């Protein structure tokens, strides 16, 4: 059970919450702050003060005063009218993440909701009732209005949820769990939907998958180095310390550890003086992607604990301030950066695939075919990898450089952060498949070189891989092999803290 405070949630805890289904509870001190802040909102309504989002309309209607008797109707109308998402739903892990992050931001005690609302969000998390939230429709400012409205709907007993492996109406799940839908009071509708939790939840899942994929890429690249009898000198510690990037030094160190007892690597001058960049520069390229991942993790952990709705309430109600914390620009930039970092891992992997299958670049059978000419072997797998990396180049176009005004030009600059976050996740799926193709080719190359000559670590990884796909002895439908390896990589390693050398043993 993980305790939410509004201030301390980490990526490592989100791994447990999203991928292992761990439950959550609220910090009592934080809940007390929620209750105290709520008293401020109720006094504002009782006194008839004009405060945006509490006693006024929204967006362009901010100058419309709402009568006390209409405050509840205002909240309900807001949720229904803003539930305008379209397209396929977010993965269930993302909608679960949205519930967690929305509760966590409310626990900062500046949003003005009742403790009841926070408790309802936590009930949904712990009972694994996850909103069906369409992926499209958010501009990323005022936050993720459309996606979060679909989240808010289910608290009211409306909309759909994922529940016990099925997609059902929210009331079906609520009834089975013995829960009553809530009725929103002043400000609560706006507090639920004005924030960055869709882009951030998707970003967290993307980061978790990207981190695992980056570690896996090092193991797979190490197998390729063996298959191509790569020169180990390029990974010497002195080379990488001379440049000074910690991430580069770390990648080189891990690859040295992975290959320390390999009989397939060579020394410079034995077979050739130096390798092509896709082998020799693995620490420099993979290390740069790790720099991206470290940046993204830092920004996500800030946003996971951020108050991103509007207005915010401070100093016991002395200050009720309309600001712009809902603007998703920091996450939009981070997700665009993540897209580039992961696309590059796929790019260099595809070049290693080419070196494994091209007979002009190695002494292996052409396209790793058991009968070159009669059987095509891995020829079209390289085509597939090339297609995926080219698609990634399109998806990697920065969403954050775009903006389009909305709400009668009141909201005249937006982040497109949710588009960036969604595209980052797509790129990661593509990158994993490219790496799966590289792994299939590297395993085949290892067989030609002699499995007994592999390092202890890569040999273990090879045998695990062969449990997923057999050796290429005849042409077959390789699409199934690629998907099997990709699924195995995702499900067997994505919940680990990291893929270290011992994880493969």
Curated annotation (Swiss-Prot):
Contains an active site 4-methylidene-imidazol-5-one (MIO), which is formed autocatalytically by cyclization and dehydration of residues Ala-Ser-Gly. It is found in: Cytoplasm. One of its GO terms (biological process) is L-histidine catabolic process to glutamate and formate. The keyword Lyase applies. InterPro entries: Aromatic_Lyase (IPR001106), Fumarase/histidase_N (IPR024083), HutH (IPR005921), L-Aspartase-like (IPR008948), Phe/His_NH3-lyase_AS (IPR022313). The keyword Cytoplasm applies. It comes from the Bacteria. This is Histidine ammonia-lyase. The gene is hutH.
């Amino acid at each position: 059970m993980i305790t939410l405070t509004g201030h301390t949630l980490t990526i490592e805890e989100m791994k447990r919450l999203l991928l292992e289904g761990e439950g959550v509870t609220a910090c009592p001190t934080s809940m007390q702050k929620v209750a105290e802040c709520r008293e401020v909102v109720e006094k504002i309504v009782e006194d008839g003060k004009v405060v945006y989002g509490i006693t006024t309309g929204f967006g362009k209607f901010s100058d419309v005063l709402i009568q006390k008797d209409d405050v509840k109707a205002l909240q309900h109308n807001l949720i229904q009218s803003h539930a305008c998402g379209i397209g396929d739903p977010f993965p269930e892990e993302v909608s679960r993440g949205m519930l967690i992050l929305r509760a966590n931001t409310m626990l900062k005690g500046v949003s003005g909701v009742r403790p009841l609302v926070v408790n309802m969000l936590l009930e949904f998390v712990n009972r694994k009732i996850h909103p069906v939230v369409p992926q499209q429709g958010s501009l990323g400012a005022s936050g993720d209005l459309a996606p979060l409205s679909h989240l808010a709907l289910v608290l009211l007993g409306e909309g759909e949820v994922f529940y016990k492996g099925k997609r059902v109406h929210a009331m079906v799940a609520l009834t089975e769990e013995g829960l009553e839908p809530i009725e929103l009071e002043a400000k609560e509708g706006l507090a639920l939907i004005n924030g960055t939790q869709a882009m951030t939840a998707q970003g967290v899942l993307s980061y978790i998958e990207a981190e695992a994929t980056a570690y896996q890429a090092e193991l797979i690249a190490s197998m390729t180095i063996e298959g191509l009898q790569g020169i180990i000198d390029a990974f010497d510690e002195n080379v990488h310390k001379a440049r000074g990037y910690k991430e580069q030094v770390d990648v080189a160190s891990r690859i040295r550890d992975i290959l320390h007892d390999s009989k397939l690597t060579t020394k410079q001058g034995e077979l050739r003086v130096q390798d092509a960049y896709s082998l020799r520069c693995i620490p420099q390229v993979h290390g740069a992607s790790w720099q991206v991942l470290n940046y993204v993790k830092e920004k996500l952990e800030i946003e996971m604990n951020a108050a991103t709705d509007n207005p915010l309430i401070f100093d016991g109600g002395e200050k009720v301030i309309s600001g712009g914390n809902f603007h998703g620009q920091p996450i939009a930039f981070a997700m665009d950066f993540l897209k580039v970092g992961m696309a590059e891992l796929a790019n260099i992997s595809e070049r290693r695939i080419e070196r494994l299958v091209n007979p002009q670049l190695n002494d292996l059978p052409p396209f790793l075919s058991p009968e070159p000419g009669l059987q095509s072997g891995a020829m079209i797998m390289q085509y597939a990898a090339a297609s995926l990396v080219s698609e990634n180049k399109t998806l990697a176009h920065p969403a954050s450089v775009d903006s389009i005004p909305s709400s009668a030009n009141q909201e005249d600059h937006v982040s497109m952060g949710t588009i960036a976050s969604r595209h980052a996740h797509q790129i990661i799926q593509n990158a994993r498949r490219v790496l799966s193709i590289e792994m299939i080719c590297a395993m085949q190359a290892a067989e030609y070189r002699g499995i007994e000559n592999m390092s202890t670590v890569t040999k273990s990884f090879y045998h695990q891989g062969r449990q997923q796909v057999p050796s290429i002895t005849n042409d077959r439908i390789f699409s199934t092999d690629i998907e099997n390896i990709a699924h195995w990589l995702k499900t067997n390693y994505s919940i680990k803290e990291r893929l270290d050398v011992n994880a493969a043993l």
